[in-house]
Amino acid sequence: MLFAGDRKVWKSFSSYTQNINILSAELSKIVINGYVFPEDCGSIDTNKKILFKKLFSEYYERRIIGFNSFKSGKTWMLLGNEADKIERKYIGYGFSNEYGLFDTTGTAAGLCTDNLKIKAMCELIEKNESMLFWYTTCSKKIIIDEYIRNILKKMNMDKMEIYIYYNNELGNLHTIIILCFENGVFLSSGSCCSLSYNHAIEQAILEAKLIKTVYYDRGGIPYRTFKRHFFFVENI
């Protein structure tokens, strides 16, 4: 069974956060050419059945990307509806002298192809918008209004120092990035790209909550003692 044996699975629950369940796991490890591919996966939801589906979906996405170590291979082009041949560097993690280490992937796993197209596209745009956030000055800081404040309260995050940013450079989709601090210590971040602005806000906050619980609250975050980096907070 997927969740049996020596695989590590953690579940968190708190009645103070609107019955939100958080699940994380380390189900396998893939090492190719000395590189360890992302091995952990996590999910957050009020419905336990959906919680496990989300977790397995992320696990499956990362596992398939890790196994696709070929130099080139056959694929099915959804836009052209035809078979094609594609080089490895276009569908995964890689290295080039021009860009260094890079990630070209927007991935999705599920049963509905139409939904998967949108999800994968949003993830790819989210990654590129995140690059613009970190390395340019095109992001806009969002004022935390009552709508956002209520979501933070539901997640028990309203006492934290929260910064939220908006990117919309690569199309009509909305990308939200959230940074979370407490007493000057960086705790967590979350991001989401969506056709809906409100959905992007909600999912970015949920991701930040998930990451904080999985890494910081369990004492596993490696940079928990780093003080706040004022450059990317004060100058965007």
Where are these regions (language model features)?
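Helix-biased "structured C-terminal domain" signature
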Residues: 1-236
